[in-house]
Every structure is written in structure tokens, then in C-alpha cells.
Regions:
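Sec-exported extracytoplasmic/periplasmic mature domains
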Residues: 59-66, 149-157, 173-180
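Hydrophobic h-region of N-terminal signal peptides that target proteins for export
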Residues: 10-18
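A metal-dependent hydrolase signature that marks the N-terminal structural subdomain at the beginning
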Residues: 18-98
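Active-site scaffold of zinc-dependent metalloenzymes
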Residues: 93-141, 151-154
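An amphipathic, basic-hydrophobic helix/alpha-beta surface used to engage anionic
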Residues: 144
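Metalloprotease/metallohydrolase-associated module, dominated by Zn2+-dependent proteases
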Residues: 112, 138, 158-220
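A mature extracytoplasmic/lumenal domain signature
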Residues: 28, 46, 87, 118-120, ...
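Positively charged n-region of N-terminal signal peptides that target proteins for export
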Residues: 1-4
């Protein structure tokens, strides 16, 4: 889900006060960066365990050609990407934000913040609808890729102002298609509808390690 910061809020922040000035963890360790074609402009923020999980999901994303291409294009944008854990990312467990300037659509781009719930299980916190109107998986890696797709276009100035969610889902579906092929599984195309939380049954206790109860309550 995209959340563009209000212009009046951004105007009150100097460029040096944006999120990238706080203590961050690089996506790759120094030795790893030499061999990686992506990630030099990506920083993470969270507990050590959350950093491990974010790195794992990004590694899974990079193992798919579409995912690797997205990460390479994010690096070549020349802007910074900050990914932080947030237990309050309730709509599909992620949201992407950038300064609300014309650079988002004029080919220049902006630096971007992704807030993502790094505590969700690998299987994901939500499901999404296929074009056959069936609920299908929305794993943590697929969810994070969706946010990276938003970031890709914001950072390259190719963001569709009135159709940003459709744009990200188009990218996500190509990622899903390639992922399904690599896993030798059937491909299910996602439609342009927000995710549906995976909620506990009446007899089950909510899993508070990833704010399941809060996510489900917010959906009602």
C-alpha cells in the first residue's frame, strides 16, 4: 500500500532531516557489497532478528530474475531506500512513502521509505484474490516485493499518480509468474484488490508476535 507523505509535512522537513540520517544497517555487509549488483543504496532498521528476516526475503526476491532486475534498477536510480520494521503497517503489512513532489512522475525520482512488519511469518499475514476470485498466497517475500515495486517507480520518477496500486500489482504479477515457473507451480494472477488478513478462528489464540489481532481488527 502506498502512503505519500503530505506536501505540507515534507515542506517542514529539511533534506538532511529525512529518515536516512538515523543509524541504519546496510542491506549487505561491506565484504558482500563487492559482488552484489544491487543493495548499495538500501538500508534497514529493526532488531537484529528483524534485519535477518528482511535480508532473507530480499535474497529470495533477488533469486527471481524480475526481483533482481527491480533491485538493480532501484540501485541505479541514484536515490536511497530505507526499509524499517513497523508493527503498525496494517494493510498488507507494508506501506511505501516518498516526498510528494513532481519528481515522482517526471523521471527524476525521490528517496523512499518502506515501512514493513518484519515479524510476519514467511507464509505472510494476508492473502490476495486471483483473477478467478480465489484467495491465493501472499508470502512475506511477495508482499515485500510489492512494496519494492512501488519504490522502484517512485525512485525512478515513473510513478503512476492515479494508478499506483495497479502499477505495482502489474510488476508483482510478473514476479509471481517467474517465481511460480522456478518452483514448478501453477501461476495465479493477482487482481487489483487489497490483501485479506489471515485471521485466527474463534477457537484460536491470535499470534501476537506479528500483531495478528491488531491487523484483523483493523480490517473489520
Amino acid at each position: 500500500m502506498v502512503k505519500i507523505l503530505l506536501s505540507m509535512v515534507i515542506a517542514s522537513l529539511s533534506a538532511s532531516a529525512y529518515a536516512y540520517d538515523i543509524a541504519l544497517t546496510p542491506l549487505h555487509g561491506f565484504a558482500e557489497q563487492v559482488d552484489k549488483p544491487y543493495g548499495k543504496n538500501i538500508s534497514l532498521h529493526g532488531t537484529p532478528q528483524q534485519i535477518v528476516r528482511l535480508r532473507k526475503w530480499i535474497s529470495q526476491i533477488a533469486s527471481v530474475p524480475k526481483g533482481l532486475d527491480t533491485l538493480i534498477r532501484i540501485q541505479s536510480s541514484g536515490h536511497k531506500l530505507f526499509i524499517t520494521h513497523s508493527a503498525y503497517s496494517l494493510v498488507s503489512s507494508g506501506r511505501t512513502a516518498a516526498p510528494a513532489t513532481s519528481n515522482l512522475i517526471n523521471g527524476i525520482g525521490e528517496s523512499v521509505d518502506i515501512s514493513f512488519n518484519a515479524n510476519i511469518p514467511d507464509t505472510g499475514s494476508h492473502q490476495v484474490l486471483s483473477n478467478g476470485q480465489q484467495l491465493i498466497e501472499y508470502t512475506a517475500a511477495q508482499n515485500l516485493y510489492h512494496e519494492l515495486a512501488h519504490a522502484l517507480h517512485m525512485m525512478n520518477g515513473t510513478w503512476r499518480f492515479f494508478a499506483s496500486e495497479r502499477q505495482a500489482i502489474e510488476e508483482e504479477n510478473e514476479f509471481r509468474r517467474q517465481l511460480a515457473k522456478s518452483q514448478q507451480r501453477p501461476f495465479s494472477e493477482r487482481v487489483h484488490i487489497s490483501g485479506v488478513p489471515i485471521c485466527p478462528r474463534a477457537s484460536e489464540v491470535p499470534d501476537e508476535s506479528w500483531s495478528q489481532q491488531l491487523i484483523c481488527r483493523n480490517h473489520r
